[in-house]
């Protein structure tokens, strides 16, 4: 999950510039995504998440351990692993964009809180993209127990990192 976890904060850190929706509105008269979703954020977030995943892949293929725990594998070979890592990183940001689209439809402005949805949107996106890219790997690695653990831990991690981002001036809201 590290590629998914890191793509969002790096999108916020390096984002800005031209919005993905180009300022266009949907048929309801509201912005499609809003100013918070930019090409620079999308590409830099995917790149940074992918890069973190590449480091994980490299370490796992070398048998690296932390406190006696092996690094997770992302596939039987480098190519398969890189596909999974890219799916996790890109899926996270597309999940976040999907959520933004629906928040705009609900009339919620950029930065408005939508509890649990704000914390788990990128997880769902990462899982969907990863399942589509590598279904066998996904099913064998994201067991119900692992998925439940991710669903429980992610909101706490998300809130913590957002508060840090708020205090260092990267985010406008602490959620």
Swiss-Prot record:
Pathway stated in the Swiss-Prot or TrEMBL entry: Membrane lipid metabolism; glycerophospholipid metabolism
Claim: Transferase is one of the keywords in the record: yes
Catalyses which reaction(s): 2,3-bis-O-(geranylgeranyl)-sn-glycerol 1-phosphate + CTP + H(+) = CDP-2,3-bis-O-(geranylgeranyl)-sn-glycerol + diphosphate
Record-annotated membrane-spanning stretches: 41-61, 82-102, 122-142, 150-170
Taxonomic placement: Archaea, Methanobacteriati, Methanobacteriota, Stenosarchaea group, Methanomicrobia
Protein name: CDP-archaeol synthase
GO cellular component: plasma membrane
Molecular function as annotated in GO: CDP-2,3-bis-(O-geranylgeranyl)-sn-glycerol synthase activity
Family, similarity comment: Belongs to the CDP-archaeol synthase family.
Organism: Methanosarcina mazei (strain ATCC BAA-159 / DSM 3647 / Goe1 / Go1 / JCM 11833 / OCM 88) (Methanosarcina frisia)
Annotated keywords: Cell membrane, Lipid biosynthesis, Lipid metabolism, Magnesium, Membrane, Phospholipid biosynthesis, Phospholipid metabolism, Transferase, Transmembrane, Transmembrane helix
General function of this protein: Catalyzes the formation of CDP-2,3-bis-(O-geranylgeranyl)-sn-glycerol (CDP-archaeol) from 2,3-bis-(O-geranylgeranyl)-sn-glycerol 1-phosphate (DGGGP) and CTP. This reaction is the third ether-bond-formation step in the biosynthesis of archaeal membrane lipids.
InterPro entries: CarS (IPR032690), CarS_archaea (IPR002726)
Gene responsible for this protein: carS
This enzyme's EC code(s): 2.7.7.67
Major localization class: membrane
Alphabetical GO biological process terms: glycerophospholipid biosynthetic process
Cofactor: Mg(2+)
Keyword Magnesium attributed: yes
Subcellular location: Cell membrane
Membrane-topology annotation of the record: Multi-pass membrane protein
